[in-house]
């Protein structure tokens, strides 16, 4: 009996505990990133932003949570009730499930699997189903049009993101996210005789891929200037028009968790994960999770600034950028990287 407990029950309990801790921390981080997003946007427009609930408005996200939870959920009379309520749940759960393999520090992951990047790509590809289900089940033309736009947009930019990831995998030689971070201890900087630093991270040697990934991540998560899924002037709120209360909150939560995931992926793939910017003794004392969170917040700051400054693209411009610009660039970089590694015997 003790053998069964040690072999099966105890590992399951540990994974469940890790999952609960990750979920709580993730929700708190998302709440304050949403607060930061609103504050940055307000600062650009010379406004104060959230400033009433708590000091400097720090508890605004939690007040919004209570507001959504206690509102009455309204379901359109012609909607497919089961699918209508299931869609936001699917979006939120799938968005949070992808975080199971993200290492925020060395050894700090719920599941440190050898195909972590493949797992993320597979799960995130399913998130579009929640949007499509919500748009179709609403039995309204505007949500349905928003869902169709979302499906086309996400599929288009997943191709570019996939090629970017292939380029990183060719360079590193592993699908394990921890291995990808540790491989960035050495790079262009150390080849030039410099100490380990941010010059060794993949953002420098794969800079075109870093730019393609960042812009594709904006489109994949429906962030401005690619928020055509919920363009206010055309589709009001897109697939979320008919949603209110907790179902709307779940859609909104799934969207921001996906944005945070893209920031975390940029950190892991290109910005050295939990590694300090320079390998010196006083920076090495700082816990790796602090460096990881600082890099994640920097990536989110870039997302927020793009939202504040860049005007929305037209739908044809969005599709042209994905298929006629990013796809050829990312495909060329895959071939160029593979050729370089083969010629110089690094493969």
UniProtKB/Swiss-Prot annotation:
<keyword id="KW-0874">Quinone</keyword>
<keyword id="KW-1133">Transmembrane helix</keyword>
<keyword id="KW-0812">Transmembrane</keyword>
<keyword id="KW-0997">Cell inner membrane</keyword>
<feature type="transmembrane region" description="Helical">
    <location>
        <begin position="13"/>
        <end position="33"/>
    </location>
</feature>
<feature type="transmembrane region" description="Helical">
    <location>
        <begin position="198"/>
        <end position="218"/>
    </location>
</feature>
<dbReference type="GO" id="GO:0005886">
    <property type="term" value="C:plasma membrane"/>
</dbReference>
<feature type="transmembrane region" description="Helical">
    <location>
        <begin position="82"/>
        <end position="102"/>
    </location>
</feature>
<comment type="similarity">
    <text>Belongs to the complex I subunit 1 family.</text>
</comment>
<protein>
    <recommendedName>
        <fullName>NADH-quinone oxidoreductase subunit H</fullName>
        <ecNumber>7.1.1.-</ecNumber>
    </recommendedName>
</protein>
<dbReference type="InterPro" id="IPR001694">
    <property type="entry name" value="NADH_UbQ_OxRdtase_su1/FPO"/>
</dbReference>
<dbReference type="GO" id="GO:0048038">
    <property type="term" value="F:quinone binding"/>
</dbReference>
<feature type="transmembrane region" description="Helical">
    <location>
        <begin position="50"/>
        <end position="70"/>
    </location>
</feature>
<comment type="function">
    <text>NDH-1 shuttles electrons from NADH, via FMN and iron-sulfur (Fe-S) centers, to quinones in the respiratory chain. The immediate electron acceptor for the enzyme in this species is believed to be ubiquinone. Couples the redox reaction to proton translocation (for every two electrons transferred, four hydrogen ions are translocated across the cytoplasmic membrane), and thus conserves the redox energy in a proton gradient. This subunit may bind ubiquinone.</text>
</comment>
<dbReference type="GO" id="GO:0016655">
    <property type="term" value="F:oxidoreductase activity, acting on NAD(P)H, quinone or similar compound as acceptor"/>
</dbReference>
<keyword id="KW-0472">Membrane</keyword>
<feature type="transmembrane region" description="Helical">
    <location>
        <begin position="286"/>
        <end position="306"/>
    </location>
</feature>
<keyword id="KW-0520">NAD</keyword>
<feature type="transmembrane region" description="Helical">
    <location>
        <begin position="248"/>
        <end position="268"/>
    </location>
</feature>
<dbReference type="Pfam" id="PF00146">
    <property type="entry name" value="NADHdh"/>
</dbReference>
<dbReference type="InterPro" id="IPR018086">
    <property type="entry name" value="NADH_UbQ_OxRdtase_su1_CS"/>
</dbReference>
<feature type="transmembrane region" description="Helical">
    <location>
        <begin position="325"/>
        <end position="345"/>
    </location>
</feature>
<keyword id="KW-1003">Cell membrane</keyword>
<dbReference type="GO" id="GO:0003954">
    <property type="term" value="F:NADH dehydrogenase activity"/>
</dbReference>
<keyword id="KW-1278">Translocase</keyword>
<feature type="transmembrane region" description="Helical">
    <location>
        <begin position="161"/>
        <end position="181"/>
    </location>
</feature>
<comment type="subunit">
    <text>NDH-1 is composed of 14 different subunits. Subunits NuoA, H, J, K, L, M, N constitute the membrane sector of the complex.</text>
</comment>
<feature type="transmembrane region" description="Helical">
    <location>
        <begin position="115"/>
        <end position="135"/>
    </location>
</feature>
<keyword id="KW-0830">Ubiquinone</keyword>
<dbReference type="GO" id="GO:0009060">
    <property type="term" value="P:aerobic respiration"/>
</dbReference>
